[in-house]
């Protein structure tokens, strides 16, 4: 647990390596469990190497198979494919447009909600997405409706009235259309997929489809940065819980590279201090921060 000694996240000034020199795009379907389970990888990568890259979630938006067109590649994607699985577990097809006949469907409404939340900032969008996924996968909500989306907005501490206005707005619709177009251009055929680009280079990007070991993502980041990069110390357990608000023992153990037993001993100490609440859901133990929220970044 040595890595937990750092009390705050202090990003040092850039030296030989360019600050935020890599742009990462995580292509997701919010209703896909695999896209939820990759989040601990992204959190850990951001905590350790966040000074080298920025990240943005791209909502893919599945199209019903009976209405979906075949792929129409508008232009060749300047991207290199690595370790892409030969069989897609979540196959779907795009033509880069929002299908308005799907406007009342759950996938469309959920995608619009994420874009509406993002209009209040990228952090707001990420918080909303995580809260939405908790409802879907922990409380078995298969068809999120408007009422639940508003509850997610409230729980995410974003401006609910602004969210209501944006949910069916032209701005949210345009943002979703841009995500679909970008998904099409990047030839995304499996979710989750992570695409890396160097921000100041015309070199090809790198795409990895599916979920792999954490070391693979670090290796790809190092390849793009093109200089020796070192991980930052991880924040204290309290800082992590304060930022995520709700997280499982399994996720925390992965982030700190410790056993669940060791992590839960530390978490129970926080429970005794009345800083977290233990919640058992579906044979997994979760921890809810019950003090005031504080952002990691």
UniProtKB/Swiss-Prot annotation:
Principal subcellular localisation of the protein: cytoplasm
Subcellular location(s) of the protein: Cytoplasm
Gene Ontology cellular-component annotations: cytoplasm
Coiled coil location: none
Keywords: Cytoplasm
Keyword Cytoplasm in annotation: yes
Family: Belongs to the SpxH family.
Oligomer and partners: Interacts with Spx.
This protein's name: ClpXP adapter protein SpxH
Gene: spxH
């Amino acid at each position: 647990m040595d890595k937990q000694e750092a009390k705050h996240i202090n990003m040092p000034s850039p030296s030989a390596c360019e600050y935020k020199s890599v742009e990462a795009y995580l292509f997701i379907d919010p209703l896909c469990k695999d896209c939820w389970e990759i989040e601990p990888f992204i959190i850990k990568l951001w905590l350790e190497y966040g000074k080298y890259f920025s990240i943005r979630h791209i909502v893919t938006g599945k199209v019903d198979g009976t209405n979906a067109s075949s792929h129409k590649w508008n232009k060749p994607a300047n991207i290199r494919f690595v370790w892409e699985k030969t069989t897609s577990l979540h196959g779907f097809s795009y033509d880069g447009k929002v299908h308005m006949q799907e406007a009342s469907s759950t996938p469309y409404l959920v995608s619009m909600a994420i874009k509406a939340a993002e209009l209040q900032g990228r952090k707001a969008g990420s918080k909303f997405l995580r809260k939405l996924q908790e409802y879907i996968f922990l409380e078995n909500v298969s068809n999120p409706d408007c009422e639940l989306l508003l509850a997610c907005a409230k729980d995410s501490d974003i401006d609910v009235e602004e969210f209501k206005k944006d949910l069916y707005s032209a701005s949210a619709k345009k943002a979703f259309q841009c995500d679909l177009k970008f998904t099409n251009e990047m030839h995304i055929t499996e979710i989750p997929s992570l695409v890396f680009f160097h921000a100041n280079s015309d070199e090809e990007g790198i795409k990895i489809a599916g979920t792999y070991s954490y070391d693979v993502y670090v290796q790809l980041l190092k390849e793009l940065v093109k200089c020796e990069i070192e991980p930052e110390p991880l924040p204290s357990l309290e800082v992590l819980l304060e930022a995520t608000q709700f997280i499982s023992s399994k996720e925390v153990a992965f982030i700190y590279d410790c056993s669940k037993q060791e992590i839960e001993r530390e978490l129970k100490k926080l429970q005794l201090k009345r800083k977290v609440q233990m919640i058992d859901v579906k044979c997994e133990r979760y921890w809810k921060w019950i003090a005031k929220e504080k952002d990691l970044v």
